[in-house]
UniProtKB/Swiss-Prot annotation:
Heterododecamer (2C3:3R2) of six catalytic PyrB chains organized as two trimers (C3), and six regulatory PyrI chains organized as three dimers (R2). It comes from the Bacteria. This is Aspartate carbamoyltransferase catalytic subunit. Pathway: Pyrimidine metabolism; UMP biosynthesis via de novo pathway; (S)-dihydroorotate from bicarbonate: step 2/3. The lineage of its organism: Bacteria, Pseudomonadati, Pseudomonadota, Betaproteobacteria, Neisseriales. The gene is pyrB.
Length: 306
């Protein structure tokens, strides 16, 4: 079967078909079970991070090196010609002349699509503002499949900052293709955006609003936690919600045995350390899967056959 991702930009989950997502998922699982060190041999990848990152940057660079490729780039846009006023379009033009693919993170929504428009090589979006984070979504899909044995018709609860969290937006857009059911737990001011719930409606996916993490843990197959950012509230408002969206081990007492708790990390207070010792915690394994997910993306984008 032809590789449906060869020479493709990876910008948004919405751009990818279910067939392409399944190809990425199965390739990630295959590379995890049977690693290969030759798929990027002779390839040079540009790692262009205009804002700080730990897991995403390091796991992408690990993926490149494990596949036999090499990396050039930067980890902070302040030390590039962007600081002098160079446009993103020009940066993409220049770096695409040096490399076989560009991995880009940028603070502005839509920046990845701008880079793709002017790049001569595939652009992989490593996060653009509050918009999209497709490689995170792929590692989430790998983790969900790994823990549940399927993606079809799962119950997915999402908690915390659902308004600004690009990870939960992208994950909803991916899992709607498998007819999953969703539940949302958040402060009213950080509710899931209308455009996401409208997409779920159009796909025929059911969703509900729940009032507590205990309810979510009892209902769900996957509980996807995110951080409620203190800086988005005044002190009085934050005091009202503080702790309400922080998960503790005692809240998992009525959870189904197959429930797994995921988090894009870094966590602060929203998952208590006592959850780490429960059989439901899976966020560190989730982070490890980032390497295999990104190996799959790079392998498929840069090889006709994998």
């Amino acid at each position: 079967m032809p590789n449906p991702l060869y020479r493709q930009h990876i910008i948004s989950i919405s751009d990818l078909s279910r067939e392409q997502l399944e190809c990425l998922l199965q390739t990630a699982l295959k590379l995890k079970a049977h690693p290969r060190g030759d798929l990027l041999e002779g390839k040079l990848i540009g790692s262009c991070f205009f804002e700080p990152s730990t897991r995403t940057r390091l796991s992408f660079e690990t993926a490149v090196q494990r596949l036999g490729g090499k990396v050039i780039g930067f980890s902070d846009g302040a030390n590039t010609s962007a600081k002098k006023g160079e446009t993103l379009a020009d940066t993409a033009r220049i770096i695409s002349g040096y490399t076989d693919a560009i991995i880009q993170r940028h603070p502005k929504d839509g920046a990845a699509r701008v880079a793709a428009e002017f790049s001569r090589v595939p652009v992989i979006n490593a996060g653009d503002g509050t918009n999209q984070h497709p490689s995170q979504t792929l590692l989430d899909l790998v983790t969900i499949y790994e823990t549940q044995g399927r993606l079809d018709k799962l119950k997915i609860a999402m908690a915390g900052d659902l308004k600004y969290g690009r990870t939960v937006h992208s994950l909803c857009q991916a899992l709607k293709r498998w007819n999953c059911e969703f539940a949302f737990v958040s402060p009213p001011s950080l509710a899931m955006p209308d455009y996401i719930t409208e997409e779920l409606d159009e796909a025929g996916c059911r969703y509900r609003i729940l009032g507590s993490l205990e309810e979510a843990a009892e209902w769900a197959d996957i509980l996807y936690m995110t951080r409620v950012q203190r800086e988005r509230f005044d002190e009085q408002e934050f005091a009202k919600i503080q702790g309400k969206f922080n998960l503790e081990a005692s809240m998992l007492a009525r959870a189904k045995p197959n429930l797994r708790v995921l988090h894009p990390l870094p966590r602060v207070d929203e998952i208590h350390p006592d959850v780490d010792a429960t059989p439901h915690a899976y966020y560190f394994e989730q982070a490890t899967n980032g390497v295999y997910a990104r190996m799959a993306i790079l392998s498929l984008v840069l090889n006709e056959e994998v």
